[in-house]
Regions:
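Ser/Thr-glycine-rich phosphate-binding loops at phosphate-binding pockets of nucleotides
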Residues: 1, 26-33, 95-100, 406, ...
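Conserved non-catalytic scaffold segment of RNase H-like nuclease domains
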Residues: 86-196, 210-232
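Catalytic DNA-binding helix-loop module of base-excision-repair DNA glycosylases/AP lyases
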Residues: 542-545, 556-568
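N-terminal accessory regions of nucleic-acid-interacting proteins
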Residues: 41, 45-88
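Helix-rich "cap/lid" substructures immediately adjacent to catalytic or cofactor-binding pockets
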Residues: 495, 508-552
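Short alpha-helix plus adjacent loop in nuclease-associated cores
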Residues: 70-74, 140, 188, 198-219, ...
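Substrate-recognition/cap helix-loop segment adjacent to the acidic, metal-dependent catalytic center
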Residues: 180-197, 338, 342, 347-349, ...
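Mg2+-dependent phosphoryl-transfer active-site scaffold
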Residues: 4, 8-24, 31-40, 250-498, ...
Length: 943
């Protein structure tokens, strides 16, 4: 499903089917992308695990590759150069033909202009009797009909005259490969060998004028102010091409290029020209780890440098990164197949074949559509078989293995309906004529190739496919090791920052609880190699604060005292306590303080320092460190930060300052067809079919709702586009290459943006590379604006302000009545997260008194099925209050420890509940834990 709106089967289903059939391997080759690799790998890992549990070994290999869009940038502007200067003689010619194939189609007109010393000196023009009727489409295009060529000379009569006209001259044509292939083919049939220098004005124009949007003859004539009188008439096209060529000769002299040899030396295509080349399909397989990296380099280049409707890969780049790669000739859209259909010369075909490591043929049904094409000489299935026979002959002649492949786009024959729907949605008129691009069995493939003879059929279906498989090592699509970024002295840096800040807050002698908690955290963080993550977050937050914007810490990072002391979060996770800002008196353990265990220190009553008389600070939110880094402190921290949406882009840019240019990438995402979109595709398809039937007097197509839903289900999750995580930044350690992990690209292939994302969905590589969550949020922006408007520092606003808390119960503090604001009873309408009907109903049900109540309400509002029919009911029945109900996962661990349960057991219960293991009945320890909770007086409603 990762071939863009083309493939419709999950890679996991294809792999499982191949294994059931006893196949030894399967190659994953999506169009232009490699985004199915990680799913394929995870499928294999799961299957190998399942086999291992049964004491069996799964002998199956994934071959990782791509069906690339290959462009040939290796063609030289001048073929067979012999040092001719541009003052020599040139014959600029053009042909009109009955079709595109030099092998079977005929020449109907030859037009030529001789150029010497940059001046037109002679002309040659003649019709040619093709001895067959001129197809109607050719007559429409050229306005040449059978009457006009009836009495013209035949090709065997006129071609020698034309070649005599060209003798000693360099031949020039627009898209010379087409015209010269006809000349060479027809000359060979009458025993004449054509060995001349040839210049292609398309390639020459691409070199001299790389920024044109295309290089059609009429485009060039307009650009160079050349007259083109009757386009698609040989004599007029040749004259126009000659005028263009003369102007381009002057441009060559201006560049100090006086002859054809120097033209070939200088005339290399730039990126713009390469992007405009016609693409061919080509299979590229990675045979080993080096090949995988080189494959990713090619995929990245195709998306970043050469994308033009398709991610194109130049041949020269393939040659540069060829180590570890196996190159196949692909399908009917491949370069070799096209050259055979178009009747290219033997020399050209030999050049093409020699580029590939193996050649491909496919079932006749795959290419049956060619029989219906007016512009293709293929008339029947035997013509298609002959093309495959020719490829087999070329394989034998050049020593290239020929492999029979089935070009799988869907798993089973009946699955074509999904692709039909998708193709129709893209506007293809022939969507209903689906080729049999399903996964074939070995027997089916042998039957498809039986016209080759049983021995040769077995060779291409079995022997050679296994030969390719044996050339490929078992590899993983992503380097398996963890590669965190490195910041020099990050361990000591974090320790110093935290200890200095702790002393600033708690005084020269730290309370024992602070020392023990901080030391435990720092030891866990540093010993597990996580200090760099804290330092990165610290640098980003401090930079934002210095620039005037607060940063909100999301989620469980607030449970880390090290994060508090590093300035990453203002949330203090210690148990509630009093602290004197002047003399550092503290109170963690008085009965008055213990009463607020599991709550928030800011909810405690105001108090004066018994030592110096200063007002005590009320601190601590009682969040266990285990919720962040696990019970043993070895869980990887997930530091999510909310930056101002106005500042987010600057924070992203600052990561490049921290790590260096080219070391950070936006986290990539893959957009697929959603359920409703798929349903819309199916509905539209059948509506349009019914409308067409109505015009043709046929009955409408009626599909039951369940059938529409079934078909829509098969269209879900097909790749549609790519994008970027709103705040995710992937960090590559210095000294590493991104292609060890993933290719890269622009989001949605937008070539106008400088943003570069990972090609793989970021979830596929988040175990290998660090992803920073630098999110944009409105709240820090609003706080900054309010600070500017009022002059009040938001960090100095007391969290126990009675007036502020009253907003969650009535409107009196605002100086207005409910009837003034449409009957709204609360003053929370403008407070983020609390202004919805659902949230305000929660407020009215729970009647929050304290700041900790608001935290609990936020937990209930964002959980799944924890309020409606759950906590709400318990509160209404009087079994619980907002203070005693389970509102966050931390509540479970803290409460169970308070009830006397072992801390590790309390942690495990919390995690099993959080992960849904208890609710789904998948927690085998639950009966034992439940009894333990009962024994410790935990009420039934809580359990």
């Amino acid at each position: 499903k990762m071939s863009d709106m083309d493939g419709v089967s999950y890679v996991s289903d294809i792999i499982k089917q191949a294994i059931r059939w006893g196949h030894k391997a399967i190659a994953i080759t999506d169009h232009g992308v490699v985004q199915a690799f990680t799913d394929a790998f995870h499928t294999m890992s799961d299957l190998k695990g399942s086999y291992a549990k049964k004491g069996e070994k799964l002998d199956f290999k994934i071959i990782y590759g791509v069906e690339a869009y290959l462009v040939d940038d290796t063609k030289q502007i001048v073929t067979n150069p012999r040092g001719q200067s541009f003052n020599d003689t040139y014959v600029v010619f053009d042909l009109e033909t009955t079709g595109f194939s030099a092998e079977v189609d005929r020449i109907i007109e030859i037009g030529a202009v001789k150029v010497c010393n940059g001046e037109i000196v002679d002309r040659f023009s003649t019709f040619v009797n093709p001895e067959i009727p001129i197809p109607f489409r050719i007559e429409t295009l050229t306005h040449i009909n059978d009457q006009m060529v009836m009495n013209a000379p035949k090709i065997e009569e006129i071609l020698p005259e034309f070649l005599e006209f060209c003798e000693g001259a360099v031949m020039v044509a627009h898209n010379a490969e087409f015209d010269t292939s006809f000349i060479i083919n027809k000359a060979e049939k009458i025993g004449i060998n054509v060995d001349t220098t040839i210049i292609d004005t398309v390639l020459l124009a691409q070199f001299l004028m790389p920024n044109l949007h295309n290089y059609k003859l009429d485009t060039l004539t307009k650009h160079l102010n050349v007259v083109l009188e009757s386009h698609h008439r040989a004599v007029d096209d040749a004259a126009a091409t000659a005028d263009i060529f003369v102007k381009m000769i002057k441009m060559l002299y201006d560049r100090d290029i006086p002859d054809v040899d120097k033209l070939n030396e200088e005339g290399k295509m730039d990126e713009n020209a390469i992007k405009k080349l016609h693409q061919y399909h080509c299979i590229i397989l990675a045979s080993n780890e080096m090949g995988r990296i080189n494959l990713y380099r090619l995929v990245s280049a195709s998306h970043l440098q050469y994308f033009n409707r398709f991610p194109k890969i130049p041949k020269s780049l393939v040659n540069q990164y060829r180590e570890g790669l196996i190159i196949g000739s692909a399908c009917e859209a491949g370069e070799l197949f096209r050259s055979l259909v178009n009747g290219r010369s033997e020399a050209e075909i030999a050049r093409i074949v020699n580029f590939y490591d193996y050649l491909e043929i496919q079932p006749i049904g795959n290419n049956r559509f060619m029989i219906e094409k007016e512009d293709c000489y293929v008339q029947n299935e035997e013509d298609l078989r002959n093309l495959n026979r020719r490829i087999v002959e070329l394989g034998d002649k050049f020593g290239k293995p020929v492999v029979a492949t089935c070009d799988v786009h869907f798993l089973n024959p009946e699955d074509e309906v999904y692709r039909r729907i998708i193709m129709a949605g893209k506007g293809f008129d022939d969507a209903d004529n689906q080729a049999p691009l399903y996964l074939h069995t070995t027997e089916e493939m042998l039957h498809e190739c039986d016209y080759l003879g049983s021995d040769k059929a077995y060779e291409v279906v079995v022997t050679n496919t296994n030969k390719i498989m044996d050339m490929c090592e078992e590899i993983e699509p992503v380097r398996p090791d963890k590669c965190p970024p490195f910041i020099e002295n990050s361990d000591q840096m974090l320790r110093t920052i935290c200890e200095n800040r702790a002393h600033e807050i708690y005084g020269p002698e730290l309370p024992q609880i602070v020392t023990e908690r901080l030391e435990r955290e720092l030891n866990s963080i540093i010993s597990n190699g996580y200090s760099v993550m804290y330092i990165i977050a610290q640098k980003l937050v401090w930079k934002s604060n210095d620039d005037g914007y607060l940063v909100g810490s999301r989620g469980s990072v607030g449970s880390s005292l090290a994060a508090t002391m590093a300035g990453i979060t203002e949330v203090n996770p210690l148990i509630p306590h009093y602290l004197c800002p002047k003399c550092y008196y503290n109170d963690f353990y008085s009965d008055e303080v213990k009463a607020f265990a599991g709550g928030a220190g800011c909810d405690m009553p105001d108090k004066i320092c018994p030592k110096c008389g200063a007002k005590l600070n009320k601190m601590g939110f009682d969040i266990p460190f285990e919720t962040f880094l696990g019970f043993k402190g070895n869980k990887e921290p997930d530091i999510d930060l909310n930056f101002s949406n106005e500042y987010q882009s600057k924070a992203h840019a600052y990561t490049e300052v921290i790590f260096g240019k080219g070391q950070t990438f936006k986290a990539g995402t893959i957009g697929t067809v959603a359920e409703k979109t798929a349903y819309g595709f199916v509905m539209k398809y059948f509506e349009e079919k019914s409308a067409k039937n109505a015009l043709e007097g046929k009955p409408p197509i009626v599909k039951r709702k369940c059938e529409i839903e079934r078909i829509a289900e098969g269209c879900i999750d097909i790749r549609r586009t790519t994008g970027q995580h709103p705040g995710g930044i992937v960090v590559l350690p210095i000294g590493e290459e991104i292609h060890s992990f993933t290719p890269v690209q622009h989001p949605a292939n937008d070539m106008t943006t400088s943003i570069v994302t990972t090609h793989f969905d970021y979830h596929s590589i988040d175990h290998n590379l660090l992803k920073l969550d630098i999110l944009g949020h409105l709240d820090p922006t609003m706080i900054r604006m309010l600070q500017d408007l009022t002059g009040i520092d938001p960090l100095e606003i007391p969290l126990d302000s009675k007036e502020v808390m009253s907003l969650f119960q009535n409107t009196s503090a605002l100086g207005i009545k409910p009837e003034d604001i449409g009957g709204t009873k609360l003053g929370a309408l403008g407070i983020p997260e609390f202004g919805t009907d659902f949230a305000m109903q929660m407020l009215m049900d729970t009647k929050p008194q304290y700041f900790s109540d608001l935290v609990r309400i936020a937990g209930l509002a964002h959980g799944t099925d924890v309020w409606l029919g759950n906590a709400q009911t318990l509160i209404k029945e009087g079994k619980a209050t907002i203070s005693t109900a389970i509102c966050t996962r931390d509540d479970i661990m803290i409460y169970l420890i308070q009830k006397g349960l072992d801390s590790e057991e309390s942690f495990k219960i919390m995690e099993m509940v959080r992960k849904g293991k208890v609710a789904s009945g998948k927690c085998k320890e639950w009966p034992e834990w439940k009894q333990d909770m009962i024994d410790h007086g935990v009420p039934d409603w809580y359990i």
